[in-house]
Amino acid sequence: MTSSASSPQDLEKGVNTLENIETLPQQGSIAGVSQGFPNIQEIYSDRDFITLGSSTYRRRDLLNALDRGDGEEGNCAKYTPHQFANPVPLGLASFSLSCLVLSLINANVRGVTDGKWALSLFMFFGGAIELFAGLLCFVIGDTYAMTVFSSFGGFWICYGYGLTDTDNLVSGYTDPTMLNNVIGFFLAGWTVFTFLMLMCTLKSTWGLFLLLTFLDLTFLLLCIGTFIDNNNLKMAGGYFGILSSCCGWYSLYCSVVSPSNSYLAFRAHTMPNAP
């Protein structure tokens, strides 16, 4: 850095001079060394002043000029952070719709027992879209929602793939009891997972808590009904699944409705001791 020690410039009635500022310790330096580059000047700063090459400025005035001080219009463009949309309603929509259709089939509503036509719904809307919502929750830093939506998105894909009987997943079993046991193991695993996620909603909203409560009962009844091949238990699981879906619809509506877009605005009721 080049400076003229023979002609100090008074900064404020002789209190501080350019010569004094240039001899400050370089702890506040924010620029590199100018060795070998004669056209590059160094930058030093202390509490009140900033030195740019051979010129010294008051810190307050320089920040005001850069539009970082008292709000005066400066020459530097302001940085506006990008706002991401909330992906949770999308995850709730894909889960609630798929759960409702499957539960109606499990409950044998209107005598329906074969749900192969809903395969596309399970794999694409319940599976792919919910998995996509979970990945978007990863982007916004919501670990819980990412885990729940991504996991259940995988569940719907697995369930739909099993219905296709690709690679003889079902028809390859010659013993119906063994097939029921394998499916029962699958449902038992999801019963445990859902219970763990349920324990993480004790300080959340009532809608989410009841959704996972009814869903865990759904998996439990379907699991037991599959193990013992009892259709009444499977139907009971279907009815609990309908309740779980209704809780999902309510939570979905509460998360997207507002006085600006609807005259009928509900609010999500929080659990006791919720933060």
From Swiss-Prot:
Residues in the Extracellular compartment per record: 1-84, 142-181, 229-236
Signal peptide: none
InterPro entries named among the record's database cross-references: AceTr, Gpr1/Fun34/SatP-like, GPR1_FUN34_YAAH
Induction: Expression is under the control of the ADR1, CAT8, and GCN4 transcription factors. Also induced by external ammonia and in rho(0) cells.
Location of the protein in the cell: Cell membrane
Topology term for the membrane: Multi-pass membrane protein
Phosphoserine sites (modified residues): S4
Main location: membrane
Parts of the chain on the Cytoplasmic side: 106-120, 203-207, 258-275
Transmembrane segments: 85-105, 121-141, 182-202, 208-228, 237-257
PANTHER family found in the cross-reference section: ACCUMULATION OF DYADS PROTEIN 2-RELATED (PTHR31123), AMMONIA TRANSPORT OUTWARD PROTEIN 3 (PTHR31123:SF3)
Protein task: Transporter protein required for ammonia export. Induced in rho(0) cells, probably to eliminate the excess ammonia that arises because of a potential defect in ammonia assimilation in those cells.
The name this protein goes by in its record: Ammonia transport outward protein 3
Natural source organism: Saccharomyces cerevisiae (strain ATCC 204508 / S288c) (Baker's yeast)
